[in-house]
Amino acid sequence: VKPLPGDSPDMDFQAVANFQQQTSNLLRETSLGRKNLDEAEERLRYIEAALPRTTRVTQAHFQEFERLEKELATLKMRLMGDPILQQKNESVSPSITSRVGGVAYGHWDTRQQPTETQKAQIESAARDYQAYKGDLKSFMDDLEAFQSELQKAGAPWTPGQKLD
């Protein structure tokens, strides 16, 4: 194989491919996290509609619903950033998805070595996402437990509800 003009003779194409694969894997994982948040948001929308029609609903159920809504908003902010500030072109800290997306956008159409900044962005995003995944799993477990509790309290069916 003959290198193209402009390619360095000591170019490590395998290292470039490995970095792009690492970026791709992280992008896929963050997309899955975003999909989980979207599904949780829809489940909470149905739960909100079901709460007033639940036969044995208590104030604690409403408080738990509010807690879950706030936690979902926090998780969305951590993964995707603040959409309000972004719409107003305000300066915001980069979110996990913006760091991964920025690297993917800036590096996937090239055969050049990733920059140190790109490497640092992926390392930072991967580290933050590992911590985030644990929090997301905990939230999803809490949501499932809450749905089960509502089912026992006589709530109408909502998406994601499991058979007991």
Question: Model-predicted segments: where are they?
Answer:
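Low-complexity, Pro/Ser/Thr- and charge-rich linker/hinge segments at domain boundaries
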Residues: 1-29
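Mature extracytoplasmic or organellar-lumen-exposed domains after removal of signal/transit peptides
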Residues: 22-164
